């Protein structure tokens, strides 16, 4: 049986006058932007370098930029504000397993981050997103837009559901990288790890 609606079942919409987006109030003013990045190393990888360059370019255009980041923190233009969301930063720790007993653990999210990391997972995007969503609960109206820098975290959906407009930048296709790794794996067993 077809799931398609017949014309009789389709809702009717009243025609609207076209709206010139340039005429909307507030559209032609500097934006208050929140730019998340779960880690923003200023010298290696691309996220910290991208964050420094894009926020400087946006500040040059007159926008008000806040960057919310986990460690390592980015180096930003002085016109941009850095909001630090501390994590366990287990990738910088030569003995991450010891973090459980070192007094670093503050809450259950830290326990989850520690467990997930030490069992071979990659918890940073998830745990950063949870911390950021909690931080954002009292700041829903502080920003015109949240421009995600590839955190791809669930916390962004929570922020969207709070009423914050969210958009994202993805720098490269992870799935393509995975397919290439699997195709060129010397051992079929390692292709599934």
Regions found by a protein language model. Name each.
Residues 33, 145-148, 160-179:
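Active-site proximal beta-strand in glycosyltransferases
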Residues 149-154:
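Short, solvent-exposed amphipathic helices
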Residues 47-58:
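Short amphipathic alpha-helix
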Residues 134-137, 174, 185-193:
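Membrane-proximal helix-turn-helix segments that form the acceptor-binding/catalytic region
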Residues 92-96, 176-183:
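Short, charged, surface-exposed secondary-structure boundary motifs
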Residues 37, 69-71, 170:
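Short beta-strand/turn micro-motifs composed of small residues
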Residues 61-65, 143:
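A generic structural motif
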Residues 2-7, 11-12, 17-31, 66-131, ...:
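A conserved catalytic-core segment of Leloir-type glycosyltransferases
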């Amino acid at each position: 049986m077809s799931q398609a609606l017949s014309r009789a079942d389709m809702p009717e919409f009243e025609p609207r006058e076209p709206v010139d987006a340039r005429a909307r109030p507030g559209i032609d003013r500097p934006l208050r932007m929140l730019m998340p990045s779960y880690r923003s190393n200023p010298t290696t990888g691309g996220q910290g370098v991208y964050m420094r360059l894009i926020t400087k370019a946006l500040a040059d255009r007159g926008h008000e930029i806040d960057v919310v980041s986990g460690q390592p923190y980015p180096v930003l233009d002085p016109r941009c504000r850095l909001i630090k969301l501390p994590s366990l930063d287990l990738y910088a720790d030569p003995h991450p397993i010891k973090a459980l007993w070192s007094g670093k653990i503050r809450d259950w999210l830290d326990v989850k981050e520690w467990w997930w990391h030490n069992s071979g997972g990659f918890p940073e995007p998830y745990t950063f997103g949870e911390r950021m969503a909690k931080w954002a609960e009292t700041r829903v109206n502080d920003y015109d837009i949240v421009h995600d820098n590839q955190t791809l975290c669930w916390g962004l959906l929570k922020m969207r559901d709070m009423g914050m407009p969210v958009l994202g930048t993805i720098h490269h296709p992870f799935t393509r990288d995975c397919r290439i790794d699997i195709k060129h794996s010397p051992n079929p067993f390692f292709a599934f790890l």
